[in-house]
Amino acid sequence: MEFKTRFLQDPRQSFFLFGPRGTGKSTWMKNTLENAIYIDLLDAEVFRAYSSRPERLKEVAEAQKPGTTIVLDEIQKQPQLLDVVHQLMESHTGCRFILSGSSARKLKRSGVDLLAGRAAVKTMHPFMAAELGENFSLEEALGIGTVPLIVDSPNPKEAIKAYAALYLKEEVQMEGLVRNIGAFSRFLESISFSHGAALNISDVARDCQVERKTVEGYVSILEDLLLGFRIPVFSRRAKRRLSSHCKFYYFDSGVFRSLRPAGPIDAHQEMEGAALEGLVAQHLRAWNAYGNGLCKLFFWRTKSGNEVDFVIYGQDTFCAIEVKNTANIHAKMLRGLLTFREDYPEAQPCLLYRGKEHLKIKNVLCLPVEEFLKNLKPLNPLRGDMGSKPTYG
C-alpha cells in the first residue's frame, strides 16, 4: 500500500504521539523515522518481555549510539515503562524517545505525568483533504470519513461499521473503562444526535436511562480516547447573552455516520448536514494541530438563536465560519455571520456551501466547501485559504 505523506512534522525531540486507532501513527513512524529502534507493545512476545522486565528498555537504550531514536508503540499497554524512559532522559543517554498510543487515559490513571513535560505532545488526525490530494472526494468523506484505516480498506463501508465495535471491545471493554458496556453502547448512539449540536448532558442521560454523572464520565472517556471533542462558546467581550452549552463532535464524519441511526423517519439531509459540519471541524482541528497550535476553536450562539458554527481565534487569526449543506445561498443563511460581525468587526466572516462559485454577499465571502478543504494546509494562514476572486451578489 502506497504511503501517503502526512502533514505531521517530526519535532526532532522526544515526544508523545497520540491519535485514535487507525489514524496512521504506526505507518507514519515506520516511514518517517529512519533507523529507529521500534518496540511494538501490541506484539504478544514483546509485551511479555517488557512486562516482566521493564528494565530491559534501559539495556536496549544503553547499547545504542547517541542520537538513536527509540519508538515505543502503544505505550499505554505498559505505562510503567515511562518511569524507565524518564530515568534514561535524566541520565542523558543521548537517545530520543517517541511514545505512541491511542489514548493518554490509562497513563493518567496509572499516575504518570507524561514525563513531567520533558516530551512534546503531538496528535495524529484523520486524513486532511490536502493529504489525499486528487483522491479526496467530498461525497466519500461524508459517508465513510477520512480515517486512514477505513479509507485504505478494500471494503471501506464494512470497515467503518466494524470500527466502533473495535473500540468497544479493545479500548473500553478490555481496559475496564465502563461497568455497563450495554449502557455505553446506547450512549454512543444517543450522543450521535448531538454531533454538531449543543450538548445537553441531562437529555442524553434521560435517553440512555442512566445518571447524569455517568454520561459525564462517558463523554470524558470519548475525549480521552480521542473519539470525540467539545468546543466552547466564544465569549470574549460578549455583548449579548450567550448559550452556556458546548458543542460536541465525533472525531470523524464517517464514525459519526456509522453510529447515527438511519431509518425511514430519519432525515437524510439533517444527517448529511451534521456530517459536513463535523468534517470541517475535524479539518480545522488538524490544521491547527499540525501547524503552530496557537489558535483555539469555538462556536458562537446567542440566547436569541443567532449562531456561527466556528470561530477560530489566535494571535493573528480571527475568523467566523458558517457551514451550509446546500448549493444555493439565501440571505437568511448569513444572519448569524452578520450579527457576529456587528459585535466583532475585526473578524473575517466566511460561509462554506456545496455550490461551485466564489461569491461575496453583503461583504461575506462564500466559498465551495470542497475547495476550502482541499486548500486547507498547516501553517498557511486561514485567511489565505479564503482568498479568491469573488462574484459579487
Where does each model-flagged region fall?
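Conserved catalytic/switch belt of AAA+ P-loop NTPases
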Residues: L82-R105, D113
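Accessory nucleic acid-recognition modules appended to NTPase machines
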Residues: E158-F318
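Short regulatory helix/loop adjacent to the ATP-binding pocket of P-loop NTPases
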Residues: R105-A120, F136
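Hydrophobic anchor at the beta1->P-loop junction of P-loop NTPases
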Residues: L17
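Conserved lysine of the Walker
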Residues: K25
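Pre-Walker A adenine-sensing motif
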Residues: M1-Q13
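Short glycine-rich substrate-engagement loop in P-loop NTPases that contacts/grips substrate
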Residues: I39-T68
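Hydrophobic positions on the alpha1 helix immediately C-terminal to the Walker A/P-loop
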Residues: W28
